[in-house]
Amino acid sequence: WIAESQMMKETEDVVHMTLDFLPLKSYANITEGNALRVDWESVVPKHELSYIMGNPPFVGYSFQSKSQKDDILSVYVDEKGKSYKSSGKIDYVSGWYFKAAQLMQGTGIRTAFVSTNSITQGEQVAGVWKPLYERFGIHIDFAHRTFRWDSEASIKAHVHCVIVGFSNEPNPAPKRIYTTERYQEVENINPYLLDAPNVFIDSRTNSICNVPQMVYGNKPTD
């Protein structure tokens, strides 16, 4: 309804007249709840789905409330139900990737999310994506690299985003990396949104070469 109303207003501005709402059929299939606590298959059976699309909340791990951190810790768990070591240092949007990857198992569902770009940068990459690749066997089908989020709301959202499409079934379509002006067909898209092998750079406490010990380095965080 919100999108329909926005588009109708823009159309009225173009044609300079008042219009009736488009004859779109409405379905009352909205479920209210915490998406990271709800069993998604209790909302809709996964074998009835073809696509999952969304724009999950943008909350960097440094700005999450206690309840949001608890949400992530409850979602990002291994096969034994234990939270992954990195679960406390990943953005809130990551929970939607994990829930989608779980639901997609044994299906041909394809998923795409608009997300904070930090999940494709730095140490978050291994924390977010390594469980998805190793446990659920997902692969990235297409990606739009970082772009500035420009909403039409009165209070603008000052965030930089990416769009990532992924699945765990073979996809014959060409893999594409998009930027604002163009796209590139590639052999593989890794979690850093590069045309390169799927390599994860984990954080480590010991140096890989003979250099002085670093006590505390530069720390850009979101």
Predicted regions and their residues:
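Conserved residues in the N-terminal Rossmann fold of short-chain dehydrogenase/reductase
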Residues: T31-E32
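Signature of N6-adenine DNA methyltransferases within the class I
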Residues: W1-E12, H16-D20, L24-K25, A35-D222
